[in-house]
Amino acid sequence: MDKLLVLTQLADLLNRQKLRWAVGGSLMLYLRGVVSDFEDIDLFVTLEDAQQVIELLDQVAIPQETVPSEQFQTVVYKKYLMDGVFIDVMAGLRLL
């Protein structure tokens, strides 16, 4: 499926629930015209909304295995596959 269509579906899902979110990574650069394509959807949510976002994505996407990183100590990090597009969900981003 088209990556932008997945983003649109994801945005609609989150906005209907009035959840706070933003995109980052290569998608943000793509939307700003800096790069010509993006790999996945890096989704940043608030710690307060993280559990609800996870519950929503558990219903519409396939959870993927995540590998912990010593460099990033993000409080919430989940990975999903939705219609062929990978989505990384992050809340409480921490860099060491």
Residue ranges and their predicted role:
Residues R20-R32:
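Short helix-loop-helix/strand-helix junction enriched in hydrophobic and basic residues
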Residues A61-L96:
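Conserved catalytic core of two-metal-ion nucleotidyltransferases
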Residues L31-V53:
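Catalytic metal-binding acidic patch
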Residues L7-A11, I54, Y77:
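Short amphipathic alpha-helical segments and helix-helix/interface helices
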Residues L27, D49, L93-L95:
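Short, flexible active-site-adjacent loop segments at beta-strand->alpha-helix junctions, enriched
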Residues M1-A22, D49:
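Helical scaffold of the NTase/Pol beta-like nucleotidyltransferase catalytic core
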Residues V53-V60:
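Short amphipathic alpha-helices in soluble, non-transmembrane regions
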